[in-house]
Amino acid sequence: MGKIAIKYSAVAVLTLSLLLTALAQTGQTRRVRFPKGRTTAVLKGAVIRATQDQFLLGARSGQTMTVHITSLEKNAVFAILGPNGVALDGAEEGSDVMDWSGELPASGDYSIWVSPTRGNATYTLEVTIR
């Protein structure tokens, strides 16, 4: 009985550890809302090291999206994933993207993931859809 309890305890600790690690890597998730009559949304936020903020944005195939990010220390970057979960060309994670513009290939929710390149980052994200 003692060995079984130890095995289950070890599995529970490992599962909890993995869950907490996954939660620590995600900052805020927000839906992008455009002010009435506007095509640009300005979003402000802050991310700490090893976390990412996610912005969800509904758009249609053929629309052009432009994304620009600024931060005081130039240490905030983003990646964009299409509705299929695949990164858009030129906006892949790890590419340290600060500016991107392109025609959207599909209709649905796009995810913009903001992360710091070093330390913590306070940022302003501008998203335009036309």
Residue ranges, per PLM feature:
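Bacterial N-terminal signal peptides
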Residues: V11-T21
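Hydrophobic beta-strand segments within beta-rich accessory/binding domains
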Residues: F55-S71, S111-V114
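Edge beta-strands of jelly-roll/beta-sandwich modules across compartments, strongly enriched
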Residues: D53, R118-R130
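Extracellular Ig-like/FN3 beta-sandwich strand-entry sites
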Residues: G62, S107-D109, N120
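Bacterial N-terminal signal peptides that target proteins for export
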Residues: G2-A12
